[in-house]
């Protein structure tokens, strides 16, 4: 199977008067089920590790796989033959209440698929995942 190259991103954000460091590391994970696309090509799925520090102390740490988003994948085409493509800090949607990360599920090399927002409350509350229909790039967007 093909493994996408690892990807490391780091961001700094000042929110609510505090400084947050956000580290996002994507890597192929051979312990996850192998994904086969519609052409029969096999891929290792990705794991994304997120670590957030606040004033240099660890604030949030979690690993994500496609399984975390499975309940939001509405069509079998969204779930089969796709991997967790990656995540990024969303500075426009983050504010004094929450850090928000964008995530995308899709086919390797295509860069299209359902998009999600991961919300991490700054008060230490439970993180949540929401499907982001505005950023969705599945190609079924309706236009007026």
Please identify what each model-predicted range represents:
Residues 72-114:
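Acidic, glycine-rich flexible loop segments
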Residues 60-61, 101, 127-130:
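Short hydrophobic/aromatic-rich beta-strand segments that constitute the beta-sheet cores
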Residues 52-59, 89-97, 119-126:
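A short, structured loop/turn motif at beta-sheet edges
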Residues 45-47, 111-116:
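Short, surface-exposed coil-to-beta transition loops
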Residues 121-144:
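Short, low-complexity, Pro/Ser/Thr/Gly-rich segments in the mature regions of secreted, periplasmic
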Residues 14-16, 93-95, 143-144:
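Blade-terminus and WD-like Trp-Asp/Gly-His loop motifs, strongest in beta-propeller folds
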Residues 34, 71-73, 111-113, 138-144:
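A short, polar/proline- and glycine-enriched secondary-structure boundary/capping micro-motif
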Residues 2-86:
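Surface-exposed acidic loop/strand-edge motifs in secreted or periplasmic proteins
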């Amino acid at each position: 199977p093909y493994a996408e190259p690892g990807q490391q991103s780091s961001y700094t954000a000042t929110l609510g008067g505090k400084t947050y460091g956000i580290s996002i590391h994507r890597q192929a994970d051979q312990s996850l089920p192998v994904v086969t696309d519609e052409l029969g090509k096999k891929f290792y799925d990705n794991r994304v590790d997120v670590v957030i520090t606040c004033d240099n102390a660890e604030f949030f740490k979690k690993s994500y796989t496609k399984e975390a988003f499975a309940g939001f994948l509405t069509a079998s085409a969204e779930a089969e033959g796709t991997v967790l493509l990656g995540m990024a800090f969303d500075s426009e949607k983050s504010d004094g209440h929450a850090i928000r990360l964008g995530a995308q599920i899709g086919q390797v090399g295509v860069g299209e698929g359902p998009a999600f927002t991961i919300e991490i409350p700054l008060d230490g509350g439970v993180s949540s995942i929401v499907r982001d229909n505005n950023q969705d790039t599945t190609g079924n967007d309706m236009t007026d």
